[in-house]
């Protein structure tokens, strides 16, 4: 059985057959749980600060702890672990995977679901610029506890770490990825042990498992409850990573890691911080680092920094993966992709994405200067993405899983209300910094909308000028031009129309190759396409045939590799005597076009900066012929 068949038939089995469960659990710790695992650095502290100066009060501490406990229980354990992880698209997760799955279940594949997916993906990218900044900054701020005199060095050290992190992306992370899991496992063990020790400072904090404390706190503190909820949400940021990385590890390792180590360690640490603050109210400024003995603080700063770098790496890799999915789904222009591993196709480096992320992350550190300031910016993008996930999950429950309406509503309504509550709490922080991820997400959504609308308009313009392929073939059969040896493959996005490159080739060269293949590349709504479903080959006559290659949106569209499959189906050609003909369009704006003039200019700029088709499809550059033409939109 081929790898692609196995992936389609049973994605969970595929993961289990390649690696044992323990090794997958360890690997998942380093990738999936880095973000949520570093939340104890700042979540409880920011919730205390949000109370307005009375944070160390027992009722406040118990209320905040109860809110954190039940946020982790409902948002992560109930929503993501229990339901969302089951909504895989042939083994893959993430907003775009869920969007394509939901669209499959609806008649006519409505555009509003696509819009939700675009917004969700844009919000993820808005969050991706904040996670590295707040995570690394909060870890380095431990220096303020260890050596207050070095406080002025927090920002320079943070910027140095971030610069190194983004610089080494070009070399790949496969060499050090093997230590991510063990380091993160050590981090969670230390979280759990240090928290368990300090619970004995005031064991009464365990009463916070009773949700009554959370409800009482909200009822008794209407004025500050919104701000506190916004800070409490920081404890669950990173929950979306469970679903984003589903395709890398499978559901079982992610669930096992959550229940066996991550969830217990987080609870113990938050309870420990709460007990420590009740016993030492003066330490509420930096409870995480302060609750460790002096001899352990420097090692904890180092371990926390390592954990936040790993968490940042996971977010960066997630951004690469999301952008690649968006490219293959034609939501973004083609960008340059470099593979940094010979054995793992998921190990990629995208220079343009990397540079933009670095600029934004560094700018955030310089602008906000501390993690408390950044916490105001953190959350609004994640809550928005989680809210969209709930809507898409409801569609999947009804249309894909065939749940009854009452059952689906019984699950989704409470979850969505909680999502809405957290979203409202984070929207309240818009002026303090929440505008940052919203601005980034809005920009990304505008780019995606412009690209899809521009491509649609360009396709319509092109189709209006095209001649049906059947008409060209019939005409050439009657008036056969001179033929030359070899094979010509003409790439086109329109399966029925005659490729513009073919028409221009006939016009300028006035010859025809012995064999002409009309080649189209199609992206499926599934993440992976089995080899036996990848190729559609149709012969018109001895000179012309049509070849359609279908790739999944998680696959790298490598045409030469796919041609090996086509050869097995009877396509005869010699790669060394095959020429690939492409059309390179120069797009001109028009004030009478279908888009506003400024959006025309944006689309043209995106098209001009897109990676060329030769590199994108892995074509041998020495065998490619590009024919230029102008199109007005």
UniProtKB/Swiss-Prot annotation:
Entry's Gene Ontology cellular component terms: plasma membrane
Topology of this chain in the membrane: Multi-pass membrane protein
Catalytic reaction list: K(+)(in) + H(+)(in) = K(+)(out) + H(+)(out)
GO MF annotation terms: potassium ion transmembrane transporter activity; symporter activity
Keywords: Cell inner membrane, Cell membrane, Ion transport, Membrane, Plasmid, Potassium, Potassium transport, Symport, Transmembrane, Transmembrane helix, Transport
Subcellular location: Cell inner membrane
Transmembrane annotation, as ranges: 24-44, 61-81, 114-134, 148-168, 180-200, 222-242, 258-278, 298-318, 348-368, 377-397, 405-425, 427-447
Superkingdom of this protein's organism: Bacteria
Role summary: Transport of potassium into the cell. Likely operates as a K(+):H(+) symporter.
Protein family membership: Belongs to the HAK/KUP transporter (TC 2.A.72) family.
Protein name as catalogued: Probable potassium transport system protein Kup 3
Organism whose genome encodes this protein: Rhizobium johnstonii (strain DSM 114642 / LMG 32736 / 3841) (Rhizobium leguminosarum bv. viciae)
């Amino acid at each position: 059985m081929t790898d692609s068949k196995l992936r389609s038939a049973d994605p969970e089995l595929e993961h289990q057959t390649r690696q044992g469960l323990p090794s997958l659990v360890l690997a998942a710790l380093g990738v999936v749980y880095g973000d949520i695992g570093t939340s104890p650095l700042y979540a409880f502290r920011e919730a205390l600060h949000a109370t307005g100066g009375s944070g160390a009060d027992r009722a406040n501490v118990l209320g905040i702890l109860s809110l954190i406990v039940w946020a982790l229980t409902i948002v992560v354990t109930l929503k993501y672990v229990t339901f969302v992880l089951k909504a895989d698209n042939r083994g893959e997760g993430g907003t775009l995977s869920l969007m394509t799955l939901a669209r499959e279940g609806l008649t006519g594949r409505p555009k509003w679901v696509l819009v939700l997916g675009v917004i969700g993906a844009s919000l993820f990218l808005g969050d991706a610029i904040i996670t590295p900044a707040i995570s690394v900054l909060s870890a380095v701020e431990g220096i303020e506890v260890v050596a207050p005199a070095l406080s002025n060095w927090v920002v320079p050290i943070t910027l140095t770490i971030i610069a190194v992190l983004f610089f080494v992306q070009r070399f790949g992370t496969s060499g050090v990825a093997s230590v991510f899991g063990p380091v993160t496992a050590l981090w969670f063990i230390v979280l759990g042990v240090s928290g368990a020790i300090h619970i004995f400072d005031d064991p009464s904090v365990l009463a916070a498992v009773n949700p009554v404390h959370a409800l009482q706190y909200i009822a008794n503190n209407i004025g500050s409850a919104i701000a506190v909820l916004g800070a409490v949400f920081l404890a669950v940021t990173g929950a979306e990573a469970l679903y984003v990385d589903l395709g890398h590890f499978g559901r079982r390792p992610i669930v096992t890691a959550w229940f066996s180590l991550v969830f217990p360690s987080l609870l113990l640490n938050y309870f420990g911080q709460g007990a420590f603050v009740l016993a030492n109210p003066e330490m509420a400024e930096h409870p995480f680092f302060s609750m460790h003995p002096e001899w352990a603080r420097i090692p904890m700063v180092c371990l926390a920094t390592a954990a936040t770098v790993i968490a940042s790496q996971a977010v960066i890799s997630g951004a690469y993966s999301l952008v690649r999915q968006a490219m293959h789904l034609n939501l973004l222009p083609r960008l340059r992709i470099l593979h940094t591993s010979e054995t793992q196709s998921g190990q990629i480096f995208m220079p343009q994405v990397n540079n933009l992320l670095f600029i934004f992350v560094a700018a955030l550190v310089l602008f906000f200067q501390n993690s408390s300031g950044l916490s105001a910016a953190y959350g609004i993008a994640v809550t928005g993405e989680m809210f969209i996930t709930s809507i898409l999950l409801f569609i999947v429950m009804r249309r894909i899983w065939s749940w009854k309406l009452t059952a689906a509503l019984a699950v989704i309504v409470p979850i969505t209300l909680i999502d809405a509550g957290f979203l409202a709490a984070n929207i309240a922080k818009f002026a303090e910094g929440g505008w940052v991820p919203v601005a980034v997400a809005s920009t990304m959504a505008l780019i995606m909308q412009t690209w899809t609308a521009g491509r649609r308009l360009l396709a319509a313009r092109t189709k209006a000028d095209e001649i049906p392929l059947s008409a060209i073939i019939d005409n050439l059969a009657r008036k056969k031009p001179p033929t030359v040896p070899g094979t010509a493959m003409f790439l086109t996005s329109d399966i029925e129309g005659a490729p513009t490159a073919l028409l221009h080739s006939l016009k300028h060269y006035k010859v025809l190759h012995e064999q002409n293949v009309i080649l189209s590349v199609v992206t499926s709504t599934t993440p992976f396409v089995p080899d036996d479903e990848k190729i559609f080959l149709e012969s018109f006559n001895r000179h012309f045939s049509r070849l359609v290659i279908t790739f999944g949106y998680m696959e790298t569209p490598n045409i030469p590799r796919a041609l090996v499959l086509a050869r097995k189906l009877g396509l005869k050609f010699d790669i060394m005597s095959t020429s690939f003909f492409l059309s390179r369009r120069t797009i001109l704006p028009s004030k009478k076009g279908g888009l506003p003039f400024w959006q025309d200019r944006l689309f043209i700029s995106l098209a001009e900066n897109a990676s060329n088709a030769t590199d994108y499809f892995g074509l041998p550059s020495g065998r490619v012929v590009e024919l230029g033409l102008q199109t007005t939109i």
